[in-house]
Amino acid sequence: MIRKYLRWLYAPIMKMIRNRKSHDRILNDTLRLDELGRQLSESQHRVFYLGITQHSNLGDMGQHYCIKKWISKNYPASELIMFEVTTVIDRRFDFFKKLKAIFRPQDVIVFQSGYTTTDLGGYHDEMHRMVIENMPDAHILMMPQTIFFRKEKNRERTAKSYDMAQHMLFLARDMVSFEAAKRMFPHVTVKVFPDIVTTLIGSFDFN
């Protein structure tokens, strides 16, 4: 009851608290790059998994689980380093300056799969563009994507950015997205690959 009548005061205070928590989380996450630079061996191969899921959506959690499993299988000796999308795109703490300081030519960037090459919401497409524009020579694996843009200007912006990538493999999880990707960024290697969650088919026995 008190909250109802003091909502005008309560709401901005709670927003301020949430913003502060977000600020501290992103700052601490970014500062991990400095610590990693001191800890990681120069001979250690690294996989940077960017855009990991931040919420409890079951589909996104399934993608995350399968991607980690795939990385573990295909890069068993590599150091896996993960960051959320909000950390990557935050411009306040020099994320890319810190990342480029420890990133080496043999390292790999892996992007979260799903419905993330789109202008329907979220920050993943912005993250993809920022990474490619800051690190066009990096080896990048774009896990299976669906492509859809409502606005032509957004599609063109993404197409121009993605086509800058010198060493990116873009996996499309449907034929419509595959054809769209080939048109949008003709200099990028594009392949068809089913949703990464399908790799779980046959993995469990429910009898």
Where are these regions (language model features)?
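Helix-loop-beta element that forms the nucleotide-linked donor phosphate-binding surface
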Residues: 178-197
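Extended, charge-rich low-complexity interaction segments
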Residues: 105, 174-176
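A short beta-strand/loop micro-motif in the catalytic core of glycosyltransferases
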Residues: 59, 167-173
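Aromatic- and Gly/Pro-rich donor/ligand-binding loops
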Residues: 2-163, 193, 197-207
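Phosphate- and divalent-cation-binding pockets in alpha/beta enzyme and binding domains
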Residues: 57, 66, 176-183
